[in-house]
Amino acid sequence: TVSRARADFGLRTFGADGGRLTLNGRVFLLRGEANCCVFPETGHPPMTTGAWREVLGRYRAYGVNCLRFHSWCPPEAAFAAADELGMLLQPELSDWNCTNALETPHSAAYYEAELRQILFCYANHPSFVMLTLGNELCTGEEGHRRMAELVRLARQLDPTRRYAGSSNGQYGEQGYDGVSDFYTAAAYGDRMLRATSSPMIGHLNRCRPGTRQNYREAAAQTGGVPVFGFEVGQYESWPDFDQIDRFRGITIPENLRAIRRRAEQTGAAAYWQAGVQASGELALRCYREEVEAELRTPGMSGLSLLGLQDFPGQGTALVGMMDAHLTPKPADFARPERFAAFFAPVVLLACFDRYTYEAGEWFTADLRVANYGRQTLAGPLCWRIAEGRTILGQGTLDAPAGW
């Protein structure tokens, strides 16, 4: 024997049918999350399967079934852990060029080499299901031509996965590129694919709160290509200052210290914990509306969040249910089971016009079941409207077999 190698592998099909992502032939709903390579103690990602098993387990507790790696590709230990846990992964090439992506021969050659290496090294892992060429890539005609060539090359090298030119390419302004296997963006042209975006647009900012909004018009623009939301959420909560002492590695939390000093100077420290809980509860409710709006949209393949983990880059983005250390925040709003209640394979939806009614007005709602579990639901759906212990109305409906 000259040499010997051992590799684990798995068999699965990840494709598309009727404009929807499918996993082993069944319609699949992406409950994704963006990981931005935030590891504040070490400054680099874990390199062992055990450590990645713990990282992925934290995400899975919140209902995540697919992890997107924002403009980077994790080590093989991440893929091995995902294989064990049944998680799916979407790595990206390390490109975040918002001006002239792939327009030079040098950059095109570099990213082609990276693409070939990723597919060569990780092709045996069934958890590896999608890849994009980078994050929010913007470019000119030559760059788009090279991006299309790389997508076709990836498909030729390994047709068992789905590929796209970019995540939120051209910020969604130009729509589908005509070559990618899926479309993920914040919008399709001027039609939103999430509830909020800059500058204060989206139905959460501009419409009366209710539960009938969806993204049907935007999702229908891709011409039968699967579509899912990009970096959905980004709702912040006040920081918990107790976490400051846990920064013992290379990251200095001077941003959190500055906020604490201001709170002490203005007197806000006296009611700070109440503010943490209130802002976090609002963030949780906004995340729920984001998720349920996607579920209310026929034809969408899900969404990818940003994010469940606080993001200390680009200033301070305290957007997570978990802090920068991937630890659930010590507050009721951040309990994993609360988020997973609506970020789940099966979710009951009540669609109504608004949350506030006056005495004498009729309340009407449509009940739906978003079922992306492994089993078809059968039997009656029981509903009840109550005020305290007083039942105002109740009944049963036939449960639809999926949505």
List each model region and its residues.
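Short linear motifs in intrinsically disordered
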Residues: R6-A16, A154, D158-P159, R191, ...
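Residue-level detector of high-confidence beta-strand sites
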Residues: R4-A5, L30, E92, Q394-T396
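N-terminal carbohydrate-binding accessory modules
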Residues: T1-R60, A80
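Well-ordered beta-strand scaffold positions
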Residues: R26, D83, G388-T390
